Amino acid sequence: MSGWGMPRPVFIVSDHTGLTAENIARALLTHFPGQPLRYLRRPFTSDAQAAQAVVSEVEALAASGERPLIFTTTTQPDVLEALQTAPAQVFDLLTENLRLLEGEFAEPPQLGAGGHHDMQDSEAYLSRMEALDFALATDDGIGDKQYGLSDVILVGVSRAGKTPTSLFLALQHGIRASNYPLAEDDFEREGLPAPLEQYRSKLFGLTIDPRRLHAIRTQRKPGSKYASIEQCEYEVRRASALFARLGLPVKDTTSASVEEIAAGVLALLRQSGRLEG
């Protein structure tokens, strides 16, 4: 934990979209689950002036008692030189590895030869931003007219983890994930809610332990019927019965991370042929 009880700032600095830098940073930092972190993305930092702007941000945070981390994949010497002056721990993710590869191949790296990869990176970035827009436009049961464009529709009771999973799938994998909250009215019918009827093949159920659900809802609406243990038990029981009756794939989110939930969704998409790789 950094100064003032705030999560430690993690700067993702790249001369392009920053997707590679962020993925590596997250892969490393996931091994320190007890560390609260907040990610600050600074893509397209391609010259010394832009790098100095990042350094100024870091200096301001350091002055308030924080010690940021900087992860960068830039190959621009002037950008790296500027970042190294920041009062932060800087992780240069490419330079040393490029030096080792230069020794293996007995030839210098062509630092300006990444055009094809840059284009692919930019396309991936745009795809993820489009998926994020779609997830927000079809969050929590809204935008059901667009369900035909969804890669997957997450279904479950309120506060079972649908929205975080939808956003994670969009941002990390470019998946168009919608989500639909099951409400009391939906449990009065034997079949699917009307907006979902023609999209059964896209549905993925999320369930949760009623006691955990009760704790989550109590934080939001203490003392309400919505948060009562009786209501939570009722909704989870009816939702589970619906999933079983329809034969839907289901993931228990009680103690699962967003990454673990998303992995289950991705496995389903691969099995159904809707996702390659």
From Swiss-Prot:
Reactions it catalyzes: [pyruvate, water dikinase] + ADP = [pyruvate, water dikinase]-phosphate + AMP + H(+); [pyruvate, water dikinase]-phosphate + phosphate + H(+) = [pyruvate, water dikinase] + diphosphate
Cited Pfam families: Kinase-PPPase
Enzyme category, top tier: transferase
Listed EC numbers: 2.7.11.33, 2.7.4.28
Annotated InterPro entries: Kinase-pyrophosphorylase, PSRP
Signal peptide: none
Keywords from the named record: Kinase, Nucleotide-binding, Serine/threonine-protein kinase, Transferase
Residues that, per the record, bind ADP: G156, V157, S158, R159, A160, G161, K162, T163
Gene Ontology MF annotations: ADP binding; ATP binding; phosphotransferase activity, phosphate group as acceptor; protein serine/threonine kinase activity
SS bond partners: none
NCBIfam families (UniProt xref): PRK05339.1
HAMAP family xref list: PSRP
Function: Bifunctional serine/threonine kinase and phosphorylase involved in the regulation of the phosphoenolpyruvate synthase (PEPS) by catalyzing its phosphorylation/dephosphorylation.
Family label: Belongs to the pyruvate, phosphate/water dikinase regulatory protein family. PSRP subfamily.
PANTHER family: PYRUVATE, PHOSPHATE DIKINASE REGULATORY PROTEIN 1, CHLOROPLASTIC
Full protein name: Putative phosphoenolpyruvate synthase regulatory protein
Originating species: Deinococcus radiodurans (strain ATCC 13939 / DSM 20539 / JCM 16871 / CCUG 27074 / LMG 4051 / NBRC 15346 / NCIMB 9279 / VKM B-1422 / R1)
